[in-house]
């Protein structure tokens, strides 16, 4: 087995590696934002509506009354609202994602499994999207299965994709020079000697150490040296490049296809064409990272796949117990679960209920998706500047965003209060205003949550703790989809959705406030423990 020094000599990160990583983000963006975010759900809902019956009597075909609430018979006496179909399929997909994340995270670390699994997921996801788009309307059950496959394989591939960057950073050659894409990676790379000789803190001492040294938890902590601060800024910029490439490519595709959809008067054939183009784009641009880029083989195992699966589940359980024993991580993971749940609920309901309840056209929904992407990208650029201007840390930014995000559903609920009948979300213009406001804080919520968590994770245990972070985030998504399925299936009143989102998005505030109080008076935690 190769030692770390031998691996470092044999493998060296180049600009091509990083460009391949960014290229994947350019390919995945249109699939996530346009295809999976808007067009695939619309195709499935349209097919479900064609096979459904009015919700009021379950006998009159929905095709005769396209604007009335519609239900679909699943089996026997079980009926489900058409808008709930996508939520239910997404809930099944998210549950499968959580189950697979527990095992695949460990398997990817052995041999070349990371590349193989990534490319397999991209191929299956791309082909599933194309088949879903062009299959006949009578193939409704098959479309739902392919919807689950597209969503499942995209999320799993995204998890594999995220794991490439730490490897590129660790094996980048250490040189000194001006700040470029290369030097940014070089600055983020740890010194090889410290990588080899690094020792981790005993688990019983981790929490006191975090409280004493983390600037997130203790504002009076010893300041980090200039190099560490510089490296943190460079890491944030690199993350922004990937995030910007992801949304930038989606915006470019929306600029191309939105006028086409408008010129063809919302011709439904544009939807499968767009999904096909996005799927092929994702497959083509993922090829360099999956096939050409080679990584060092750091871990070997002669164990069978089933043994690796068992060990990975066991390791994930111990990681969960370990994380829950550290109060700061426990509090933040609780906050992250509900923040992600609120975000996912708001974005999903904007598209699905915009179509089902407010009868937004495909063109309007495409514009809405473009607005979300554009404002999310705008927020990613502006929020860091505001953070530096007001000298805020990452935890304070997350708190502010968590306070502002519930304002959108609160505005929607306002229209149901006597005396405010003209307010609320009642027209397409109202949907655009509320969603764009929400979209502006979308990028900041995700990036700053990741930044806070990165400063809480014990040294030497980053991989397993970030796998837990992804698992908690997906738990929030699962909770969102199940809740929306139940709400939309039992009531057509949007007040239930608004109230649910407000409650979910205010729950994290108490945990974030406790963490903030620890940063002001770190001894408070020790005296209470």
From Swiss-Prot:
- Report the locations given in the UniProt record: Vacuole membrane
Q: Which InterPro entries match?
A: Atg22, Atg22-like, ATG22/LtaA_families, MFS_trans_sf
Statement: the UniProt record of this protein carries the keyword Cell inner membrane: no
GO process annotations (BP): amino acid transmembrane export from vacuole; autophagy; L-alpha-amino acid transmembrane transport
Spans traversing the lipid bilayer: 25-45, 72-92, 130-150, 241-261, 269-289, 365-385, 397-417, 429-449, 467-487, 496-516
Residues with attached carbohydrate? 198, 218, 299, 359, 489
An annotated GO cellular component of this protein is: fungal-type vacuole membrane
* Lineage top rank: taxon: Eukaryota
The membrane topology noted for this protein in its Swiss-Prot or TrEMBL record is: Multi-pass membrane protein
Q: Give the UniProt keywords, A-Z.
A: Amino-acid transport, Autophagy, Glycoprotein, Membrane, Transmembrane, Transmembrane helix, Transport, Vacuole
| Entry annotated with the keyword NAD | no
Query: Which GO terms of the molecular function aspect are on file?
Result: L-amino acid efflux transmembrane transporter activity; L-amino acid transmembrane transporter activity
- What task does this protein carry out? Vacuolar effluxer which mediate the efflux of amino acids resulting from autophagic degradation. The release of autophagic amino acids allows the maintenance of protein synthesis and viability during nitrogen starvation.
Into which family does the record put it?
Belongs to the ATG22 family.
Per its record, how is this protein called by name?
Autophagy-related protein 22
The scientific name of the source species is Schizosaccharomyces pombe (strain 972 / ATCC 24843)
Per UniProt, what is the name of the gene that codes for the protein in this document? atg22
